[in-house]
Each structure stands twice: as C-alpha cells, then as structure tokens.
C-alpha cells in the first residue's frame, strides 16, 4: 500500500509546477517601438502597450499627440487579446449584440475593437500587443502586426 501511495505522490509532484516562456523587456520594447514607428509612418499618433501572458503591462508608449484615452485603451486591447486568447478584431465580431458571447462586453477592461493581438511562438502565448489612436481598429491592427513582425525572428518557434 505504501508503495502505491509513493508512486501516486510522484505523479502529483511532477504536475505541481510548470514552465512558461515570456518576452524579455527588451523584446517587448522593440515590438512597441516598431508598432509606434509604423503608425507614425502612416500619419497616426497612437499609444502602444505590450503585456505579458498574464496581461500585466511590460511596455507602454504614447506618441506626443496621441489622445489622453489611448494609453489605457492600448493596455486594455492587449489585455483582452491575452485574456481571451483571441485577437480583438475577432472578438469584435463574436461579441456583437445578439451573439452568444455578447455578454462578455460587460467585463471591465474588455476591448471589442481591432488593435489587440496575441504574440505567440511555437504554439505558446507569450503576450499581447495593443495599439490605440489610429482611425479605426483596422489601422491599429496594421501597426500591432508590424510590432509582432519586428520581433518574429527573435522568438523561439520550436
């Protein structure tokens, strides 16, 4: 009986911890800077946030003339993408009035407009990037994608 309990405790002990991968602050900053640069090149003043896989802010940048609301909204977009494991453009469609998931729009910090994207590599969620301030979520999405593209070669894909 004691051998059985010992073997069972070994199985549980093996599952008591896990390892995750995270973006370094330098990598998060590079993504944010690239997203900001893309929006600037397109003539948009925005804020960019990069959050870790838990939704905690790693980097927040606001361009000179970006609106006062943009930093918080950029963080919320990144947080939403990470929290729901879905890019915010996809959530916008899935949570429209009359859709089964419409109620989640009432969750504090939930952002149901484009501009929040997951940062993934090798099948793992590493974090999220949110952009706010360009006219329309589609323009925010373009800038967020530029931020991810800027770090793609540095991410571990295996």
Indicate where each model-derived feature is located.
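Bacterial N-terminal signal peptides
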Residues: 1-10
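Flexible, solvent-exposed loop/hinge segments and secondary-structure transition points
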Residues: 13-158
């Amino acid at each position: 009986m004691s051998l059985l309990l010992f073997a069972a405790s070994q199985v549980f002990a093996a599952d008591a911890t896990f390892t995750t991968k995270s973006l370094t602050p330098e990598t998060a900053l590079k993504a944010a800077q690239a997203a900001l640069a893309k929006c600037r090149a397109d003539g948009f003043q925005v804020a960019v946030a990069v959050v870790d896989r838990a939704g905690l802010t790693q980097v927040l940048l606001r361009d000179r003339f970006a609106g006062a609301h943009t930093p918080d909204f950029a963080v919320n977009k990144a947080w939403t993408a990470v929290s729901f494991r879905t890019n915010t453009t996809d959530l916008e469609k899935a949570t429209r009035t009359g859709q089964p998931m419409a109620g989640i729009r009432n969750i504090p910090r939930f952002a149901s407009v484009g501009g929040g994207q997951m940062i993934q590599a090798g099948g793992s969620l590493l974090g999220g990037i949110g952009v706010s301030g360009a006219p329309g979520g589609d323009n925010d999405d373009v800038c967020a994608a530029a931020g991810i593209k800027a770090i793609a070669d540095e991410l571990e894909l295996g």
